Amino acid sequence: MAVERTFVAIKPDGVQRGLVGEILGRFERKGFKLVGLKQLAPSRELAGEHYGVHRERPFFAGLVDFITSGPVVAMVWEGDGVIASARKLIGATKPLEAEPGTIRGDLAVNIGRNVIHGSDGPDTAQFEINLWFSPEELNAWTPSDQSWRVES
């Protein structure tokens, strides 16, 4: 499996509820490598670009209002198959349909407050990483336990 990067964001509800450490821990325990991390208050412009594919949908304004309502923790994770694996860790978009053991299954109840966003594919991941991070904000590094994470 190829080493990939994906974009993950803890939304304002997850930050306000103090779930940042819990969520970071789940990705770290899985064995993924954190290569970008920052907390920010997204501008309406950034939010509009991020959710641009939904611009013509009736819920677009609500998405922008919510993601700009408080701080967001933006992350870039790296690892073998990280895009698909992150989606499994995160769980279904609708928390009541998310499996127990997933982030949304364990920590969210309502689709409008579903705690976390994760890229849904390679093209989206690249777009979102480039949108939220500059190249200088991403750190290539090798964990000391790398040989224990994946078979070479």
Swiss-Prot record:
State the EC number(s). 2.7.4.6
Its required cofactor(s), as named, are: Mg(2+)
Q: What InterPro entries does the record point to? A: NDK-like_dom (IPR034907), NDK-like_dom_sf (IPR036850), Nucleoside_diP_kinase (IPR001564), Nucleoside_diP_kinase_AS (IPR023005)
PROSITE patterns noted in UniProt: NDPK, NDPK_LIKE
The record's family statement is: Belongs to the NDK family.
Listed under catalytic activity are: a 2'-deoxyribonucleoside 5'-diphosphate + ATP = a 2'-deoxyribonucleoside 5'-triphosphate + ADP; a ribonucleoside 5'-diphosphate + ATP = a ribonucleoside 5'-triphosphate + ADP
Per UniProt, the keywords (alphabetical) are: ATP-binding, Cytoplasm, Kinase, Magnesium, Metal-binding, Nucleotide metabolism, Nucleotide-binding, Phosphoprotein, Transferase
Q: Which HAMAP family match?
A: NDP_kinase
The residues annotated as the active site are H117
GO terms in the biological process aspect are: CTP biosynthetic process; GTP biosynthetic process; UTP biosynthetic process
Where does it localize? Cytoplasm
**Which SUPFAM superfamilies does the entry link to?**
Nucleoside diphosphate kinase, NDK (SSF54919)
A GO CC annotation recorded here is: cytoplasm
Please give the Gene Ontology molecular function terms for this protein. ATP binding; metal ion binding; nucleoside diphosphate kinase activity
The name under which this protein is listed is: Nucleoside diphosphate kinase
Q: What class of enzyme is it?
A: transferase
Note the subunit structure: Homotetramer.
Give the NCBIfam families listed for this entry. PRK00668.1 (NF001908)
Q: Tell me which PANTHER family the record gives.
A: NUCLEOSIDE DIPHOSPHATE KINASE
The UniProt transmembrane annotation reads none
Function, as annotated, reads: Major role in the synthesis of nucleoside triphosphates other than ATP. The ATP gamma phosphate is transferred to the NDP beta phosphate via a ping-pong mechanism, using a phosphorylated active-site intermediate.
